Amino acid sequence: MEDDRAQVDLGIAADIDEMNPPPPPSVQQKQPKKRFLGRQSAAAGKSSSSSSNSTSQPAGANTSIEDSGAIQVAQPRRAPRMLNQVPDSILHDAALNEAIALLPSNYSFEIHKTIHRIRTLDAKRVALQMPEGLLLFATTISDILTQFCPGIETLIMGDVTYGACCIDDYTARAMGCDLLVHYAHSCLIPVDVTKIKTLYVFVDISIDTSHLLATLERNFAPGKSIAMVGTIQFNATIHGVRSTLQKAGYEVIIPQIAPLSKGEILGCTSPNLSQFLTSSGKQVDMILYLGDGRFHLESIMIHNPSIPAYRYDPYSRKLTHETYGHEEMQDVRRSAIRQAKTAKKWGLILGSLGRQGNPNTLGLIEEKLKANGTPFVNFCLSEIFPGKLAMMSDVECWVQVACPRLSIDWGYAFPRPLLTPYEALIALEEKEDWGKGAYPMDYYGREGLGRTKPAAMEV
């Protein structure tokens, strides 16, 4: 996990003692500046100078820094204290490992860590939340946890989970759970923000990297520069194949949009690759997305319309060239913004599916509408459908603070303009249109509208 990612409370915490200050010199004289060297070099130098001083130099004689005892040997560090290290009694439990073998071997559900976490917290009711693609494993995971953590009760959360923004700690808390295990997404909502103790399990998926490498070498000539991205499940693979591809003659860049991990993208958040140039100062030749489906890939394609994109599907083991209708999408979004500027009444939707909705972003738009004297009405919806919004025919423009891709992908299906927060601020003349550049996809970036802080609401 990268340094700038929201910190997870299940990592390795190091508790390092501070080094003791050196003892004061016995002779009051101006001391040379201390030099810090590697332990081996410093020890050798100190030993040599001690031997030399004892045989050839009188006390108080002028000496060089190396001979004056100014070399300070670094104190050996105490080994880090592993606060959450899974004990061997769990790792080597034969019965537990036999039960884990029922799950796919290339899927890392981190059962050992989960059991250790449950026991450490003395949790009694554990909520399990995962996307629909993993629900077929939910009952097996539940059975394993209840068998090896006697006395606990598990609750499988069956509501739709589209992404990391859908983590539902509110419902888990309301159901009396004291631990939420969220599978297959990264820590978009930090664990110090969630309302109950939370464990993120990325579900790292191992794939046949030899086929991936052979496919790339067959289709792309050495010397090409590649920006490699993917979902969190394949993040380890992306970093693992980088050195091999570089040895084969490719220049590999793993871009980052903080606070996501390097190489990780979301359907609403991806890096602008103009900030990640090659060693020769040029733009990368291509985007390579590792994963199934197009939803996340389209994010980085929208953000970087001039760079060709390819997708390697690790399940079908196929490499495909992907395209996107940038002009059509941008025309549709600009049309919606133009219509919104003449709307006499607005409707503001706060998404209530997990943590999708940001009340601070909603408040920011409210303040702008109040300043303009534009009437509006607030709604709270877990999912947004055209038929439901059509029932409020007096509302001439909608803004949904939930998922930007809902407006981008499906906005044309709604009877009235359905804007993202970014588009709403353009319509209210608080932000500039993207012009001839790329439509921004930075919703959960560090300064994105998905992370609006209360201070940003001040007018």
UniProtKB/Swiss-Prot annotation:
EC number: 2.5.1.108
Superkingdom classification of source: Eukaryota
Sites where the protein binds [4Fe-4S] cluster: 165, 268, 403
Catalysed reactions listed for this entry: L-histidyl-[translation elongation factor 2] + S-adenosyl-L-methionine = 2-[(3S)-amino-3-carboxypropyl]-L-histidyl-[translation elongation factor 2] + S-methyl-5'-thioadenosine + H(+)
Keywords: Cytoplasm, Iron, Iron-sulfur, Metal-binding, S-adenosyl-L-methionine, Transferase
Family, per entry: Belongs to the DPH1/DPH2 family. DPH1 subfamily.
Name listed for the protein in its UniProt record: 2-(3-amino-3-carboxypropyl)histidine synthase subunit 1
Organism listed in the record: Neurospora crassa (strain ATCC 24698 / 74-OR23-1A / CBS 708.71 / DSM 1257 / FGSC 987)
